[in-house]
Every structure is written in C-alpha cells, then in structure tokens.
C-alpha cells in the first residue's frame, strides 16, 4: 500500500515551497512583528492570485475542488516559511465551515469572494481563559441578533467575516457575521506570537445568519476543529523540519578545533 503523496500533490508542494522561498516569507514574518499589521498584504495578495484560497472550494463556485491532502502539502510549506497570512483561520476554519454546513444561498454569496480575496474569514469560540465547552458558551443569539464577546480570535482584524459559536434557546449555533456592521467591535489582544494576531470580537445586536442546524452547532464546531488540527500539525511538521535543517547546516559549517562541530559525538 502506497501512503505517500501523489505526483500531483508532490508537484504542488514543490511549487509552494519554491514560491514561499522566493518571497522570503521568513523575513516577511520578522517585518510583520515590527508593525501592528499582523499581516503581509503583498504576500497574501499573491497567495490569493495563486488560487490557494480556493483549493477546497468546489468548482461550481469557482474553486479548484481539490481534497484535504492538497491542503496538507500547502500547510506544511506555510509552516516551513512562517508565512504571516490569515490562511489557517480563513481556509482551514472559516471556508471549511461554509463548504460543509452553510446553505446554498450563503455558499453562492461567500465562496466566490473567498477565492477572490474579497472575503477573509475566521472562527470565534473562546470567551474566557478556560478550555471552551458548550457549557461555558455565553454569547447569545435571539431573532438572529448576536450579543456577547469572544476573545483570542485569530486574524479577526484582517478578516471581513467570522463564524461565532453562540447559544440560543434551542442549543448551540454557528452564526455568520459581517465585521463591517457598526455593532461589531474588534480590539487587539497581547499574545506571545504576534506574527499571528489575536483579537476580541464584541457584538451588540449584530445581525447574523445560521450555519448548520439550530441544535447541533457544537458538534459541527468540533468537526471543523478536529479536521483543522491535522492541517495545523502539517504546519508544525514544516516548521520543525526547517529548524532541523538549519541545525544540520550549522553543524556542518561551524568549525571548532579545526573540524566541523557536527563531527563531534555530542552534536
């Protein structure tokens, strides 16, 4: 049984690696840390032009209609080069929720705009410093109006929309909101890694649209997160491999006592 990536998937990964290396993505990430933008707009625009944001989106909406393995190889290279773009929040989380659970009207409205970059999305669940669970969701929705505050939302400032995990009289819901509405307030929150900014989102009677069912929102959220965990793992594989490669190269180039330090048993 061959569990390796296909030739097409390997080619896609090689092209992604070549692109991100050429764009000097690691240095771009350093530059982002020195600003308050939390995004390299130029790099993000080029990624959108390459069609990466439409990898999982079905062809009928203008996407490439590819599978998760294609997304995995892209994720590995994004992690390898620490790309300062909202790819994970918008593609792994937001786009996947729209593809799998939104109604046809929302799909037709949102998916083509995700491909073009007109829409950038994120997913908001956490409300306090405890692990999120359906028992501690406080943000409420009534008559399609959302009230409450989410914290630790990745890339919220650069996103145009978000999907919120909310509570209604029927149970836990997933709700789509537009950040352009005047009732939405987004504020930056300090965190350890500013290359991927995190923010709070506060809603005060914010209009929303239902994603999925009225009562099974938590199960849908868990499905999205479990799937995204694989993609985040591929990002970590890419980052770990880059660290290992740097260490090996240093051990070959650094000399001590007239020989490369990599030749010493301790190294």
Q: How would you name each of these model-derived features?
A:
Residues 116-128, 164:
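A short, Trp-centered hydrophobic/proline-enriched beta-strand micro-motif
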Residues 9, 20, 74, 103, ...:
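Residue-level signal for inorganic ion chemistry
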Residues 27-49:
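Short secondary-structure junction/hinge motifs that connect adjacent elements
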